[in-house]
From Swiss-Prot:
GO terms for cellular component: nucleus; ubiquitin ligase complex. This is F-box protein pof12. Keywords: Nucleus, Ubl conjugation pathway. The keyword Cytoplasm does not apply. Transmembrane segments: none annotated. InterPro entries: F-box-like_dom_sf, F-box_dom. The keyword Ion transport does not apply. It is found in: Nucleus. Residues 8-54 form the F-box domain. The lineage of its organism: Eukaryota, Fungi, Dikarya, Ascomycota, Taphrinomycotina.
Amino acid sequence: MTTDVKAKNPASIFSHETLLHVLNDLSAHDLAALERVSRSWNSIVRRSSVWHNLYLSEFGTKHLRRHGRIEKKRRNWKGLFRRQSNWKDGRCKKVESMLPQLLNSEKSVGEDRLGLTLTHQNNIYFCNDVQISKWSSVGNSLKCQAISSFRDETVKSGPAVMCLDNASLYIGLKDGNLLHVTVHETGFGNIENLATFSTKFVALSSHKNYICGLTNDNNLYILQHSHQAGTKLKVLGKYHVSSIEKQVAIHFQQSKEGYEVVHVVFNDYVLSGGWTVSLQEFVFNEYCVKSSRLALHDNKDIEYSQQPASAIFMYGSYILTSHPDNSLILQRLYSTNNELRIKFLGRLLGHVCGVQISKLFSCGRIVSVSKNCADICVWDLHDTNYQSIVSPLMLTCTNIHNKPVSDYEKECKVQDIGLYEDTILITLSDGRILKFLFNI
């Protein structure tokens, strides 16, 4: 390994976690050389900001020479990282749209009017405090399939969370109201207000006519939606879970022995190790909740993190967590001797910025997005041995915003990710829809 004595502190270019991943296998001689380059090595430990933002902050007309040196180091580092992580470059074409412009409404401006988006296959459901609409990805554009306006007495605040199961779309509003909309091929059905809760939902999932959600006051509800006249919503179970963080994943499993099963995955802190995830299983029927149990970890291979997961997603028996230390953790839930256990499968390395959100799809692929969309990874898990760490196929999208460099410092959250064939749909909190057509 070659070093430049005149180089700047590596902490001004890379994050501490990135250095740990890349330099994990360096010899003692190489580490000594790095220490000679930077005497203030402790500053790397104290720094947690992403190297990409630091790199961009160095750019300016008065610092072209410095920019050139950092750019050279960045290229050299990316080459080293490719050899270390076995990533591959993906070819992709970016198509960018903005829903408020497509809606062509004067009210669809401002942060409060941007609303919430939900992706399902190649469709995008958009909802704000004015209307709900369904958009379909056709070629390089978005086509409106259906649109319906809310009555003033129905919606008085914007949406906080949405979930979709077959033809039923449930919307949790910020004022605590829970709405139900039937989705048809030609449009939307009647919008009905099922119930009003004390606070808004922060997580929501549905299966058949059952709903499970976590409210902002740490109450977990298991509900049944009755389509008959009279009571629209029946409470099967209510639990106060004060220890659960707001970042949770709720997933319904297939029915067994006449009972429904729902899993709630949440961040959990262990004093002896650090942050991990725990899972609570609830078994219920149309009358009540029968039982609940907590999944156990295999102590031999439990994986900890220094910070809680920024996003949790569950598909089937697989649990996927996104972490600010540039990694994803893949785990699997299994049952043995009447016990639920969580087994660690591998830590997926490939990001250069903290991972904000990731999703596992039925086709066996994972799509993960970094903070501010600095980079996007596609992981192909098809016909892969889950016992080993999976190598990523990476789509590098450094100019994903297609705007001035200063926009990278602006906080922009990813609301949802969709994957349909070879198309990735990413919805952002500022109203933009990013579409990527990639070839593997």
